[in-house]
Amino acid sequence: MKLQLVAVGTKMPDWVQTGFMEYLRRFPKDMPFELTEVPAGKRGKNADIKRILEKEGEMMLAATGKGNRIVTLDIPGQPWETPQLASQLERWKQDGRDVSLLIGGPEGLSPACKAAAEQSWSLSALTLPHPLVRVLVAESLYRAWSITANHPYHRE
């Protein structure tokens, strides 16, 4: 199983790149984790936000692998504690399909992305900046993997 993070935005601050890459390099070879970035639409005073969301959504869905399980990152999604996420990761592995996790831009995800999702995951009831979500998702998935592999990274 391959994990794919599909995220809106291509110019992240150095701390985001550094944090994300730190966890990305830790993933085992039998569970590759990759980042696919789609460009954010131009937002200005007269921007058509609905159209921007639609376009970003189209690009995100086009970037996912055919047949991939799509999981959105969204506030109203299912909150998982770390052991629950580890169990979820195991179920995804048993399913045999690759998993694409979608992170929207400043206004969130398009209705098409939400409709295509088999699952929706809520990291927090807080509104989080989408660059930070990249790092949190990578760390959370690495921690979940460490539980399933009996790796000492996670401590109860």
From Swiss-Prot:
Top-level EC class as recorded in UniProt: transferase
Note the CDD domains from the entry.
Answer: RlmH-like
Q: Keyword set for this entry?
A: Cytoplasm, Methyltransferase, rRNA processing, S-adenosyl-L-methionine, Transferase
| SUPFAM superfamilies listed in its UniProt record | alpha/beta knot
Main location per the UniProt record: cytoplasm
Provide the residue positions that the database annotates as binding S-adenosyl-L-methionine. Answer: 73, 104, 123-128
The compartments listed are:
Cytoplasm
Entry similarity comment? Belongs to the RNA methyltransferase RlmH family.
Q: What does this protein do?
A: Specifically methylates the pseudouridine at position 1915 (m3Psi1915) in 23S rRNA.
Q: How does it assemble?
A: Homodimer.
This one is known as: Ribosomal RNA large subunit methyltransferase H
Origin species? Erwinia tasmaniensis (strain DSM 17950 / CFBP 7177 / CIP 109463 / NCPPB 4357 / Et1/99)
